Amino acid sequence: MASLATFQVENDIVDVDSTPQQGFDRDDLYKYDDVEQKAILAAHPWRTDPSYFRNVLVSSIALVKMAMHARSGGAIEVMGMMTGKILPNTFVVMDCYPLPVEGTETRVNAQQEGIEFMVEYLQGLKDVGRRENIVGWYHSHPGYGCWLSGIDVDTQFQNQQFQEPFLAVVVDPNRTISAGKVEIGAFRTYPKDYKPPKKATKQNQDQSVPLSKAKDYGAHSERYYELDVSFFKSSLDENLLQLLWNKNWAATLSQSTIQLNHDYTSKLMLDLSEKNAQLAIGLGEKTPQSQGRGFREAMSKADNEPHTNLLNYSTKGQWEAVNRSVKDGVQIGSDELQGLMSLEIQRRLFGRAK
């Protein structure tokens, strides 16, 4: 179907039947070699190189299942486990499954019932001849991007202490709907007392984080690093993908992103308003009635004096915050415009949109 093809193109899912991924062909990815896996585990090179793992290869099946599970949680965080294997410098995620855990809008933790479910699920895999082991966990960040909070870092650090090698993946379902591409990130923590290079801890400055999360965002960046994520499939995956997709094809055609993400968009606009209010105060404004005047005066002076540097009127950090605020506003407007366009197309095709 066209929508499935679009999903695969948007997420750059590579067919390994014809194009190897990260130097690994189809047999490397799909064949489980017990001897090879035991040799890698026995060598445990990640103990001497904290950044040994640099890449994550995720199957198209696992990607779709994680995205659907994250979306099903709405504003509540969900959690699941990933199964697969290890290759040199690389995690291979073949499949995933959700955990029956209780989450909130800010955190999710596996309790005793979740641990019991994991044990039973792994035994079920062995019973049907699936030899993949757990290689990590995933959870959702509804609306606030892919990064690790302090709680996430502590959870991942403990997992790496007792279940190495282990990976943490974060999915943002709200931004996935807005962008049409799965918003996903993969991370690992550094050993205790390890000091990583500064460039390794620099997070994506273009990532927009809600004001309520700003304090936690980046506060633990020296404790973990991000891995490159890419996606793969084979011709054997096509039937499974079609089955997964066909369960939701009607909703895919009839639903509008502008309506699905209505609450999320409202929160984005409110958050942007609060950020702008703080920026105005930081730029010298003291009252709500005069917010924005200081920045307009600085812009006017810069227009009249071409060599004027706006950094003279605000600190570098404030100017970067203004730049991010502008980008956030443009992104919100762009997403809304695309949503309105898709809504109009659906109305012309079906007469109305749900």
Swiss-Prot record:
Q: Does the keyword Repressor apply?
A: no
Q: Which UniProt keywords apply?
A: Cytoplasm, Hydrolase, Metal-binding, Metalloprotease, Nucleus, Protease, Signalosome, Zinc
Specify where the region named Disordered lies, as residue ranges: 193-212
What InterPro entries would the database entry show? Answer: CSN5_C, JAMM/MPN+_dom, JAMM_MPN+_peptidase_M67A, MPN
Would you name any one GO CC term?
cytoplasm
User: Which GO molecular-function terms appear in the entry?
Assistant: deNEDDylase activity; metal ion binding; metallopeptidase activity
Sequence motif JAMM motif, location on chain: 139-152
UniProt-listed Enzyme Commission number(s): 3.4.-.-
Keyword Zinc-finger listed? The answer is: no
Q: Which residues form the MPN domain?
A: 56-193
Q: Where in the cell is it found?
A: Cytoplasm; Nucleus
- One GO term (biological process): proteolysis
Top-level division of the source organism's lineage: Eukaryota
Q: Pfam families under this entry?
A: CSN5_C, JAB
CDD domains in UniProt: MPN_RPN11_CSN5
Top-level class of the enzyme under EC nomenclature: hydrolase
Q: Which residues bind Zn(2+)?
A: 139, 141, 152
Similarity comment text for this entry: Belongs to the peptidase M67A family. CSN5 subfamily.
So what does this one do?
Catalytic Component of the COP9 signalosome (CSN) complex that acts as an regulator of the ubiquitin (Ubl) conjugation pathway by mediating the deneddylation of the cullin subunit of SCF-type E3 ubiquitin-protein ligase complexes.
Q: How does it assemble?
A: Component of the COP9 signalosome (CSN) complex.
Q: What is known of its domains?
A: The JAMM motif is essential for the protease activity of the CSN complex resulting in deneddylation of cullins. It constitutes the catalytic center of the complex.
Protein name as catalogued: COP9 signalosome complex subunit 5
This chain's source organism reads: Yarrowia lipolytica (strain CLIB 122 / E 150) (Yeast)
Taxonomic lineage: Eukaryota, Fungi, Dikarya, Ascomycota, Saccharomycotina
